[in-house]
Amino acid sequence: MRNVILLTIDSLRRDVLGSYGGGFTPFLDSIQNRCIQFNQAYSTGPYTQAAFTGILTSSYYLEHGKQKMLSWERVLISEVLEKAGITTTGFHSNPYISTYLGWNRGWDVFYDSMGDEVGEKTPYIKAKEINRKVDAWLSSHVQAGTCKPFFLWVHYMDLHEPYIPDRKYINIVDPSLQMTEDEMFRLFKDVLLKRDVSDRGRVEVLRKLYCAHVREIDDALKDFFGILEKRNVLKESWVILTTDHGDEFGEHGGLSHDGKMYSELVHVPLMIYEPTKEQREMCNVLVSTIDIPPTIVYLFGLRPVHHFQGHSLLPLSDYPVRGVFGEAMDKQGSHENGEEKEIHYYRERDFKIIYRERDDSWELYNLKVDPKEINNIIEGSPQAEAMKQNLRPRIRRYQK
């Protein structure tokens, strides 16, 4: 393989994909025989900034303090590849990982849509337009059916709130759901923005609109793979597909993706597409999105990068058995007192521990018997102290 493509889909819940038990991704399901599927993959954080430090720099969000700008102490995968002479190209429409915040380092081409007009209701460029830009770039990069090895990162925003999908995708999910764009936007403002889960019926409508977007994204993925085939590069490319985080629909009393560390936000889909593969391979080992940059380095045949804290996912036989971490700022209540507090999680085998600085509290869950994280067993659990010891060194470490 000559090329590596990283496809990230904002706010993609694991449980909506057909290969993970959902039912809204027929195209993605159709290519599973060419994929390695990671069933125990975890994000380094529950929202964009906390997650993409793992995905693109193989580091953790709070290592260099509560910085909005990308620290110069972090090394982007694009910087590593650029130095190795590999063409680096990125297309996305998310302001939290924009040029303004320093995420454009090391890219030969970096499109973040910040100079373009976006819709009043939907404040991002949609996947079909991102695909057009990718196609235009490939048409110039690929000459006479060949091209210089490249790393391409594409990030879709269509799953992100405010959840205003096209009518045809709503009909696939629930044809009885008749709403205008204005009604969908009003639901977003009245329910989602206010994090109001008191009316389960309205929350369920939000979930259906979200699932309609999932079906829309699946069509965008089909178009994207079609572009790769048309430009004669798919047969020479690895494709890594994942998300930054999921979205909540009332599972733990909220909506969207605030500073929480429950599975609906941080247990994420992750798969690697290999065009010559003939049978799907499943990996049930605990892995992290922090492992993505080292994996890309491995696929290009480069030397490991000592700045990266993850481990290459490939070959699977060499991946170490270890726990996974995540960290972020807990944004709940910050609008009231202007102060954000740390929140951390650590998972090891079947147990997951969460620490909230806001109220100095701990939660512990046995995911084997309690996958929805309802029964906090921190009091009296024989695993509690050992799990705390694994997490304590990370708490407020940037202040030390």
Question: What residues fall within each predicted segment?
Answer:
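Catalytic domains that recognize anionic headgroups
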Residues: 1-400
